[in-house]
Swiss-Prot record:
Annotated localization: Cytoplasm
Binding-site residues for ATP, renumbered to this chain: K262
One matching Pfam family: Anticodon_2
Protein name per Swiss-Prot or TrEMBL: Glutamate--tRNA ligase
GO CC terms of this entry: cytosol
Entry superkingdom: Bacteria
Biological function: Catalyzes the attachment of glutamate to tRNA(Glu) in a two-step reaction: glutamate is first activated by ATP to form Glu-AMP and then transferred to the acceptor end of tRNA(Glu).
UniProt record similarity statement: Belongs to the class-I aminoacyl-tRNA synthetase family. Glutamate--tRNA ligase type 1 subfamily.
Main location: cytoplasm
Example of a GO MF term: tRNA binding
Gene that encodes the chain: gltX
Source organism of the structure: Lactobacillus johnsonii (strain CNCM I-12250 / La1 / NCC 533)
Assembly and oligomerization: Monomer.
Chain positions of motif 'KMSKS' region: 259-263
Gene Ontology BP term (one): glutamyl-tRNA aminoacylation
C-alpha cells in the first residue's frame, strides 16, 4: 500500500495582523509538510463578515513570507482544490447543508436570539449547563412544517442546525494530547451549521474544506479542542473519515504565567511589530519553533533547513509554552552578530530615519558613517531599532550628564586628565580610532594616571556618557568638532562647580 501523501493547511481568518500564536500554527504545519515532502495549503476562512479586516489576508500573507513560510496551494497560487477563500465556496457548503436536511440530519431552526437567551438563563437558574433544546420535540412532520411556515410568515429567518446523536462518545487520538473524548450530551445540543445570513459556521465549513481539499493532518491551537467533537459530528453525518488532529498547547506569558492574550500589553504579539523593530526573520522562525517543540540536544540555534530535517510532532510539548522576551532577544542577537552587514545597515538606517535622526536623502559620506555606527553596535543589538537609543550620544548636540557621571568627573584626577587628553588629541595628525587611543596613552604617560581613573573621565568628557562602544571608535565617529565641544562643555561644568 502506498504511503499517504501528507497534506496540511494553515487557515487564518483575515481579522487583523499575524499573531505569534497563529504564526506558530503556520510554522509547525509548514515544518511538518516540508519534513514529510507533503503539501502546505493556505486557506482564508473569511465567513465571519463582521470581523474581517480590509487588507487582513494580504497583511498575514506578507508576514508569513517574511518569516520564511511558503505554501503550495492558496488564493494567490491556485491549485486543484480551490477556491481557497471560504467566501467563494458558499455554493459548495449549501450543497452539503441541503444534503443533510434532505437526509433528516439537519433542520431549519427559527428560535430567535431572545428566545435562546431566555432558555439559557432558565437553564443557568436551574444549575444546568446552557444548551440548545430541540424546538420540535414531540411534533409530527406535518406539525413541524406548519410551525416553520408560521415562522416564515412572521418574517423570521432561520438558521440550520445539525442533529447530535444521543449517548455517543466522540473520541480521537490527538497527535499531541493522546486520547481525547467528549460525550455527545456535553457538546451543547444541536449546533448551528448555517447562520441566518446564509453563511456557514466555522465548524461546518472547516469540515467540508478539509475533506474536499484532502487534508490529512490538522495541527492547530489548543483552543480548538472543544471544536473537534462538533466537527466529528459533521464528519459522521456526511460519512467521511476525519483527518488526524493535533492540538498544540497554549502560549503563556513567562512573567505572569497567564495565557498570552491580545489584551496583554506587556508583550508584543504581532509579527509586524517585531519586523518594525528590526528583528531578523530567521531568528523569529527559530524562536517560534521552540514555543512548544523540543529539539534533540542542548542547542537552541537552528537554521530553517535543520528544523525541517529534525521536526517531529512527537516532540511537541504537552505543557504550555512560555513566551520569554529575553530569550527572543538573545536568539535574535545571535543572528544579528552573524548577519550580513548590508542587511543590518538597511534595517538600522530605516530605524534611524523613522526616528528622525538621519535624513531620508542621505549622502554617500553619511551612509558610510552610518555603516560604521552599525558595525560597532552590531554585537550589542538585540534588534536594530535599539540603535536609536543606544547610539543617541552620536546624535545629541550636548547630552546632559547623569548624577553618576558628574560624580566621576568631580574626582581629583579627572580635570587634569581631561585637559591633557584634549591637548594630546588635538595634536594627532588624523582623527581616527587609532590616533584617539594613542592620545589616551600619551595622556597616561604625561599624567601618570591609569586604569579607570584615566579612561572614565576621558569617555565622559569626549562622549558625554559613561557607556558606549570602544572609546577610540566613539571618538572617531563623533568627529573632532563635536568631541571638542563635549570636552569644553565638561570643563566648563567643572569650573562652575569650582573644580
Amino acid at each position: 500500500m502506498a504511503k499517504q501523501k501528507i497534506r496540511v493547511r494553515y487557515a487564518p481568518s483575515p481579522t487583523g495582523h499575524l499573531h505569534i500564536g497563529n504564526a506558530r500554527t503556520a510554522l509547525f504545519n509548514y515544518l511538518f509538510a516540508r519534513h514529510n515532502k507533503g503539501t502546505m495549503v493556505l486557506r482564508i476562512e473569511d465567513t465571519d463578515q463582521k470581523r474581517n479586516v480590509e487588507g487582513g489576508s494580504k497583511s498575514q500573507m506578507e508576514n508569513l513570507h517574511w518569516l520564511g513560510i511558503d505554501w503550495d496551494e492558496g488564493p494567490d497560487k491556485g491549485g486543484d482544490f480551490g477556491p481557497y477563500r471560504q467566501s467563494e465556496r458558499k455554493d459548495i457548503y449549501n450543497k452539503y447543508i441541503q444534503q443533510l436536511i434532505d437526509e433528516g440530519k439537519a433542520y431549519y431552526s427559527y428560535k430567535t436570539e431572545e428566545e435562546l437567551e431566555a432558555q439559557r438563563e432558565e437553564q443557568r437558574a436551574m444549575g444546568i449547563a446552557p444548551h440548545y433544546t430541540y424546538e420540535y420535540e414531540g411534533m409530527t412532520a406535518d406539525e413541524i412544517k406548519e410551525a416553520q411556515a408560521a415562522a416564515e410568515a412572521k418574517g423570521l429567518k432561520p438558521v440550520v442546525r445539525i442533529h447530535i446523536p444521543e449517548n455517543r462518545t466522540y473520541a480521537w487520538e490527538d497527535m499531541v494530547k493522546g486520547k481525547v473524548s467528549f460525550e455527545s450530551d456535553t457538546i451543547g445540543g444541536d449546533f448551528v451549521i448555517q447562520k441566518r445570513d446564509g453563511m456557514p459556521t466555522y465548524n461546518f465549513a472547516v469540515v467540508i474544506d478539509d475533506h474536499l481539499m484532502e487534508i490529512t493532518h490538522v495541527l492547530r491551537g489548543d483552543d480548538h479542542v472543544a471544536n473537534t467533537p462538533k466537527q466529528l459530528v459533521v464528519y459522521e453525518a456526511l460519512g467521511w473519515e476525519p483527518p488526524k488532529f493535533g492540538h498544540m498547547t497554549l502560549i503563556i506569558n513567562s512573567e505572569t504565567g497567564k495565557k498570552l492574550s491580545k489584551r496583554d500589553e506587556s508583550v508584543l504579539q504581532f509579527i509586524e511589530q517585531y519586523r518594525d523593530l528590526g528583528y531578523l526573520p530567521d531568528a523569529m522562525f527559530n524562536f517560534i519553533t521552540l514555543l512548544g517543540w523540543s529539539p534533540v540536544g542542548e542547542s537552541e540555534i537552528f537554521s530553517q533547513r535543520e528544523l525541517i530535517k529534525s521536526f517531529d510532532p512527537k516532540r511537541l510539548s504537552k505543557s504550555p509554552a512560555a513566551f520569554d522576551q529575553k530569550k527572543l532577544e538573545w536568539i535574535n542577537n545571535q543572528y544579528v552578530k552573524k548577519a550580513d552587514r548590508d542587511l543590518l545597515l538597511d534595517l538600522a538606517l530605516n530605524n534611524l530615519q523613522e526616528a528622525g535622526l538621519v535624513d531620508k536623502e542621505i549622502s554617500p559620506e553619511k551612509m558610510e558613517w552610518v555603516r560604521q555606527l552599525v558595525n560597532i553596535y552590531a554585537v550589542q543589538m538585540s534588534y536594530t531599532k535599539q540603535i536609536v537609543d543606544i547610539a543617541k550620544i552620536f546624535f545629541e548636540e550636548a547630552p546632559e550628564l547623569s548624577d553618576a557621571e558628574i560624580e566621576e568627573i568631580k574626582k581629583d584626577d579627572a580635570r587634569p586628565v581631561i585637559e591633557e587628553f584634549k591637548k594630546q588629541l588635538n595634536a594627532v595628525p588624523r582623527f581616527t580610532a587609532v590616533q584617539a587611543m594613542n592620545a589616551i596613552q600619551a595622556t597616561r604617560r604625561e599624567t601618570g594616571v591609569k586604569g579607570r581613573k584615566l579612561f572614565m573621565p576621558i569617555r565622559i568628557a569626549a562622549t558625554r556618557s559613561m557607556v558606549g562602544p570602544g572609546i577610540g571608535e566613539a571618538i572617531e565617529l563623533m568627529g573632532k568638532e563635536k568631541v571638542n565641544k563635549h570636552i569644553d562643555l565638561t570643563l566648563k561644568q567643572l569650573s562652575d562647580l569650582g573644580l
